[in-house]
Amino acid sequence: MATRSKSSQRWLKEHFSDPFVKKAQAEGMRSRAAYKLEELLERDRLLKPHMVVVDLGAAPGGWSQQVRRQIGDTGRVLALDILDMPPLAGVEFLHGDFREETVLSQFEAMLGDQPVDLVLSDMAPNKSGVGAVDQPRMMHLAELALDFADNHLKTGGAFLIKLFQGEGFDDYVRDMRRRYDKVSIRKPEASRKRSPEVYALGQGKRAHMK
């Protein structure tokens, strides 16, 4: 118990001294994750006016907030999450599990006949702290996001997803390379150094898989 207490105290100290946490609080952003996305979007110039962007696993809303901030009043930001999320100006939120047909039908009705330019996924499982449990759960969510992009992202579009390095990671990246003209692995500055998370970016979705 003492070890857990020390670990919790260390996490809290690190969290509140984190410059990205302070920046998020100062700028009214919902999470420090917004700055991971900011770096990724700007590095690869992923956003343009009038784009349609889908944010999977959107709660608490930092990524959707960042996208809306960057594209201004143009385009659409559609956010989905199994967790509820307080409203965000300029963001269309659907509360539900996109694996369910009813939720998927609602999403498709929201989307109408507009093509999706960019699919984002910052989804992650609730961590148990046991890698042998967490990694398969993470890869399962990643497969769901990849399947979603297969079915809803336009040809030529881009897909950005958070992954944990570990079992299944290399196979997943290979699967992405079959689907996209260019695949890059990124570790933004706002990612904590000890974290296994990286971001995989697929650009130029192919009409047909290799």
UniProtKB/Swiss-Prot annotation:
Composition skew (Basic and acidic residues), residue ranges = 187-196
The entry's keywords: Cytoplasm, Methyltransferase, rRNA processing, S-adenosyl-L-methionine, Transferase
* InterPro entries (UniProt xref): RNA_methyltr_RlmE, RNA_MeTrfase_FtsJ_dom, rRNA-MeTfrase_E, SAM-dependent_MTases_sf
Q: What class of enzyme is it?
A: transferase
Active-site residue numbers: 162
Q: Which reaction does it catalyse?
A: uridine(2552) in 23S rRNA + S-adenosyl-L-methionine = 2'-O-methyluridine(2552) in 23S rRNA + S-adenosyl-L-homocysteine + H(+)
Q: Where in the cell is it found?
A: Cytoplasm
Keyword Aminoacyl-tRNA synthetase, does the record have it?
no
Region annotated Disordered sits at: 187-210
What are its GO cellular component terms? cytoplasm
Functional summary from the UniProt entry: Specifically methylates the uridine in position 2552 of 23S rRNA at the 2'-O position of the ribose in the fully assembled 50S ribosomal subunit.
Which molecular function terms from Gene Ontology are attached? rRNA (uridine-2'-O-)-methyltransferase activity
Q: To which species is this protein native?
A: Stenotrophomonas maltophilia (strain R551-3)
- Record's protein name: Ribosomal RNA large subunit methyltransferase E
- Binding site residues for S-adenosyl-L-methionine: 61, 63, 81, 97, 122
Which EC numbers characterise this protein's activity in its record?
2.1.1.166
Protein family: Belongs to the class I-like SAM-binding methyltransferase superfamily. RNA methyltransferase RlmE family.
